[in-house]
A protein has these predicted regions:
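Beta-sheet repeat architectures centered on beta-propellers
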Residues: 2-90, 98, 117-119, 124-127, ...
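Beta-propeller and closely related beta-pinwheel folds
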Residues: 57-74, 99-123, 146-179, 183-312, ...
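Short beta-strand motif characteristic of blades in beta-propeller domains
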Residues: 85, 131-132, 182-183, 222, ...
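Structural signal for beta-propeller blades
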Residues: 91-92, 139-142, 189-190, 239, ...
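Predominantly extracellular/luminal cell-surface or secreted proteins
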Residues: 94-96, 132, 140, 144-147, ...
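A short acidic, glycine/proline-enriched capping/turn motif at secondary-structure boundaries
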Residues: 129, 136-137, 188-189
Length: 487
């Protein structure tokens, strides 16, 4: 059989392939997609590069003032360069660079009511700050800070609203377009209309729990699990819509065979994260609400994101799963969308909340013990890697030889570097080399001649020997070779 030329051209390095979470060496998908990655940025569609590194804010750990895991992080600034977060029994104030310490009032502030306070969410509503939490006695409540000097930790039931205690449950809060603050409250939706509180503004069936709420199209949208239990279970959950006025929800809820984690609305589109059974196995699913149904977009693996672990960054939807931040987008429609794992906090053991009130991503995390952190983007990650799909160019009785590899990149700067490996699906390294400023200078292209033999192989980019200040920005990859007879 005559030799056959092989050309594998990657003009734009894409996000994770459809089966990337299910197989070690996925081969299904487009050849420009990834089989695996860690801390990789595709935010600039022109290049594949190291994802953002992360660094603690000043005072942003247990050696400073952060001694609890923050859940609710306000998604916007309240005043110039000032926002807030809530976790455990601590209410935090922070800027883009520093978690506040001391001052008047003194920060962080310890919330105190009936004991064992566990912070849930935080909201800016009608010129005041509201913070929801659970506490001793299987109850919840909401505190209020006037953004000057006065705190009322038991505002919901002992202050002006004089409402009944909330249930012990997730208490996400969302500002409605009708100028009402809506609160998830177990099998109910609670509401705060100015100073009028209602712990049961809307009720759902027995044995349910509201996991997340959002506002879209002048309606409250609620993700409600039934039964209200965690773990791998065949739940019959629903997404409800409510106009905030009627005694019941609108129309038929969207039923989901699985457990709902979170809702998030961006630009008039509501996205949903849930856990369900597909192909006989449990999968995590990211989708959107469309026409009275859920339209799945991608499956992924890890932990199910909760309401405080989803958000947005530029034109991307982002979420935490198993302690790592994923991004999906861009949503503008001009470029094909991708799913990629963008960045990771220093602790992936226990994930807290995320938000970008100042334009950069903030992530709270905990090591499972006494170490806590609030981090922001800083430089570039050096524990990054990107692995292509598995290429299977062999034909019949012929074997593949890849004898030319061309890497195009933006001009290298001091310290920039990436190690390259061709690996087969048995884990054998068929060839290794590197591209670096130290060895190659300020180049924009390098050609290698691997002469790597195999039935299949993939290209792996390892940035661990690179720089946290000068990244390698890969533009294009070209692999060329031929199929030849065995022997």
């Amino acid at each position: 059989m005559a030799e056959k030329e092989i050309t594998i051209a990657i003009s734009r390095h894409r996000g994770l392939a459809p089966k990337a979470f299910e197989e070690t060496y996925p081969s299904y998908g487009n050849q420009d997609q990834a089989g695996d990655m860690r801390n990789i940025s595709l935010l600039d569609p022109n290049v594949m590069t190291q994802g953002p590194g992360m660094a603690e804010l000043t005072n942003g750990d247990q050696g400073g003032v952060v001694t609890t895991l923050m859940r609710g992080i306000l998604r916007q600034a309240v005043t110039s360069n000032v926002s807030y977060a809530f976790g455990g029994a601590k209410l935090y104030q922070f800027s883009a660079s520093t978690v506040s310490s001391g001052g008047s009032p003194s920060w962080p502030r310890t919330v105190s009511d009936d004991g064992a306070e566990v912070g849930e969410d935080i909201a800016h509503y009608q010129s005041a700050l509201y913070y929801s939490y659970n506490q001793t006695g299987s109850i919840g409540t909401i505190g209020r800070y006037d953004l000057a000097s006065t705190f009322d930790d038991d505002y919901w039931d002992s202050g002006t609203p004089a409402a009944a205690d909330l249930q012990s449950a997730p208490h996400q809060m969302v500002n409605g377009g009708d100028d009402v603050l809506y609160i998830a409250n177990g099998r109910y939706i609670a509401s705060l209309d100015g100073t009028t509180g209602n712990d049961q503004a809307l009720d759902f069936p027995q044995n349910t729990q509201t996991a997340s709420v959002t506002w879209n199209n002048n309606r409250l949208i609620a993700a409600v699990n039934r039964p209200a239990i965690s773990g791998v279970n065949q739940n019959l959950s629903s997404v409800y819509k409510w106009n905030g006025v009627d005694a019941s929800w609108e129309g038929q809820p969207i039923e989901i065979n699985g457990r709902l984690g979170a809702l998030y609305t961006k630009n008039g589109v509501t996205f949903v994260w849930y856990e369900g059974f597909l192909d006989g196995v449990v999968k995590l699913i990211f989708g959107l609400l469309a026409g009275g149904r859920v339209q799945p977009l991608r499956t992924f693996s890890g932990s199910l994101p909760l309401y405080y672990q989803v958000g947005e960054l530029f034109d991307y939807i982002v979420w935490l799963s198993s302690g790592r931040l994923f991004a999906y987008g861009p949503l503008g429609g001009e470029i094909e969308v991708d799913l990629f794992q963008l960045m990771s906090p220093q602790y992936t053991n226990t994930a807290g909340g995320i938000a970008s009130p100042f334009g950069e991503m903030l992530i709270a995390s905990n090591d499972g013990g006494s170490n806590y952190s609030l981090e922001r983007e800083s430089g570039y990650a050096t524990d990054s890697y990107y692995k292509t799909m598995l290429f299977e160019p062999s034909l019949g009785s012929l074997k593949s030889i890849l004898d030319r590899l061309e890497i195009q990149c933006n001009k290298l700067a001091t310290g920039a570097g990436v190690d390259l490996d061709l690996v087969d699906n048995k884990g054998n390294t068929l060839w290794s080399d590197s591209l670096s400023f130290t060895s190659d200078g300020a180049v924009t292209k390098k050609v290698f001649f691997p002469r790597a033999h195999g039935e299949n192989m993939r290209l792996e980019y390892d940035f661990s020997a690179g720089s946290s200040t000068n990244p390698v920005e890969i533009k294009k990859t070209l692999l060329q070779g031929k199929n030849v007879a065995f022997g």
